[in-house]
Amino acid sequence: MVKRIGVLTSGGDAPGMNAAIRGVVRSTLFKNKEVFGIYDGYQGLYDNQIQQLNRYSVSDIINRGGTILGSARFPEFTQKENRARAIKNLNSHGIDALVVIGGDGSYAGAELLAKEGGIHCVGLPGTIDNDVAGTDYSIGFFTALQTVVEAIDRLRDTSSSHQRISIVEVMGRHCGDLTLAAAIAGGCEFIVIPEVPFDRKELITEIKAGIAKGKKHAIITITERICDINELSQYIEKETKRETRPTVLGHIQRGGAPVAYDRILASRMGAYAVELLVQTDHKAILSCCVGVQNGKMRHAPISECISIDNKRQKFKEDWLDVANTLF
């Protein structure tokens, strides 16, 4: 039976991570188990930055953005000798289970710890990109969405005043969920996402068609890394003869107090992770990730959640249909 549970946050931070940490800590203590915080992700696990936590360690953090445990990217964790040192550190503290809050890379690290060290590991999806399979939504997605929509609303004010085209670059890496949701909620006229092939000439045709119908201004949302939006802005202005301005929202999307849904989702996921760990049999090493599907908590093997095929199946085509209908 699991006696000591560790918790860490890894990769890019997301609003709601603190709520998840709180959920893990309070639920572990409720089950009369001990809980340890691991600072600065896998880097901290490697450096043995591990400290026992109590219920007061997580007081007044549910409303705070970021992560009190800190986070770091630690590519050296791909090396087996570094993972061996991390496992040794866990064993030295008597930690036999670990909750990892993060994205795909964090999940992959957790799976290796389970395989190589016999550590029970549960992953919680903590990323604003919403690009983790096995869950409808990840912790932080809805807070980031609110941030992006508020920015779009402000840009629309100035775009309409100057009859201008605005291009808004949104985070997401290779996933267009945040861009797509923001475009729908912000009433944007055009959307460019990784899941749909991008044709600049086709975009110009659509913009000109809107102008011909009397459209005075427009907002274009685009997922990061698709193209250089400064160059795209110049191209659109040249082809349409309309003033065009790019805006990169950047890391502001990761910050801020989490919205209510993210706080609830993170709390539920944290509690569910502990429930899975407490119920697990030591003979069968647990390596799974938690998600919400159709409103209910679910779990699946980490290997399934980080597979390319499952990530492709996650794309919200119904959202794209709505967007195309409304635009």
Curated annotation (Swiss-Prot):
Residues the record lists as binding substrate: 127-129, 164, 171-173, 224, 245, 251-254
Q: What is its EC number?
A: 2.7.1.11
The chemistry this enzyme catalyses reads: beta-D-fructose 6-phosphate + ATP = beta-D-fructose 1,6-bisphosphate + ADP + H(+)
Question: Is-annotated flag, keyword rRNA-binding?
Answer: no
**One Pfam family of this chain:** PFK
- Tell me the compartments it is located in: Cytoplasm
Residues bound to ATP are 12, 73-74, 103-106
Keywords attached to this entry: Allosteric enzyme, ATP-binding, Cytoplasm, Glycolysis, Kinase, Magnesium, Metal-binding, Nucleotide-binding, Transferase
Q: Which top EC class is named for this enzyme in its record?
A: transferase
Recall the GO molecular function terms of this protein's record.
Answer: 6-phosphofructokinase activity; AMP binding; ATP binding; fructose-6-phosphate binding; identical protein binding; metal ion binding; monosaccharide binding
Q: Where does Mg(2+) bind?
A: 104
Regulation of activity is described as: Allosterically activated by ADP and other diphosphonucleosides, and allosterically inhibited by phosphoenolpyruvate.
* Pathway of action: Carbohydrate degradation; glycolysis; D-glyceraldehyde 3-phosphate and glycerone phosphate from D-glucose: step 3/4
What does the annotation say about its assembly with partners? Answer: Homotetramer.
Record function comment: Catalyzes the phosphorylation of D-fructose 6-phosphate to fructose 1,6-bisphosphate by ATP, the first committing step of glycolysis.
Q: What is this protein called?
A: ATP-dependent 6-phosphofructokinase
